[in-house]
Amino acid sequence: MGLSSDSPVRVEWIAAVTFAAGTAALGYLAYKKFYAKESRTKAMVNLQIQKDNPKVVHAFDMEDLGDKAVYCRCWRSKKFPFCDGAHIKHNEETGDNVGPLIIKKKET
């Protein structure tokens, strides 16, 4: 039972199924490229620090810093806002590469 010009319905059906499958494949690839990555990168960064505040902000006067200050950027420090090295474990567990913010006086 082969295709012939006598069966236009069968040829149209095959063309429609082929087009639908191609469209579905392109749609799936576009979804994987643009939307699947977004959903896994929108994880909560701050898991426990001042969760009752709408925004966590710390301000320090430059005179109060001394010669050097090291601040946490991974939100895992037990001494937050200061760094205690918790980013090392965080980086090992998540594959992240976050490190501390180091502020020091300019050497003259």
Curated annotation (Swiss-Prot):
Please state what class of enzyme this protein is: transferase
Membrane-protein topology: Single-pass type III membrane protein
Q: Name one GO biological process term.
A: intracellular iron ion homeostasis
> Where exactly is the Glycyl lysine isopeptide (Lys-Gly) (interchain with G-Cter in ubiquitin) cross-link placed along the chain?
42, 55, 68, 78-79, 89, 104-106
For this protein, what is the EC number?
Answer: 2.6.1.3
- Spell out where the chain crosses the membrane: 13-31
This protein's GO cellular component annotations are: cytoplasmic side of mitochondrial outer membrane; mitochondrial outer membrane; mitochondrion
Q: Which reaction does it catalyse?
A: L-cysteine + 2-oxoglutarate = 2-oxo-3-sulfanylpropanoate + L-glutamate
The answer to whether keyword Electron transport applies is: no
**What is the recorded post-translational modification?**
Ubiquitinated by PRKN during mitophagy, leading to its degradation and enhancement of mitophagy. Deubiquitinated by USP30.
Question: Any binding details for the cofactor?
Answer: Binds 1 [2Fe-2S] cluster per subunit. The [2Fe-2S] cluster is redox-active and pH labile and is significantly less stable at pH 4.5 as compared with pH 7.0.
Q: Where, subcellularly, is it found?
A: Mitochondrion outer membrane
Q: Which residues participate directly in catalysis? A: 55 (schiff-base intermediate with pyridoxal 5'-phosphate)
Function, as annotated = L-cysteine transaminase that catalyzes the reversible transfer of the amino group from L-cysteine to the alpha-keto acid 2-oxoglutarate to respectively form 2-oxo-3-sulfanylpropanoate and L-glutamate. The catalytic cycle occurs in the presence of pyridoxal 5'-phosphate (PLP) cofactor that facilitates transamination by initially forming an internal aldimine with the epsilon-amino group of active site Lys-55 residue on the enzyme (PLP-enzyme aldimine), subsequently displaced by formation of an external aldimine with the substrate amino group (PLP-L-cysteine aldimine).
Subunit structure, per the record? Homodimer.
Q: What is this protein called?
A: CDGSH iron-sulfur domain-containing protein 1
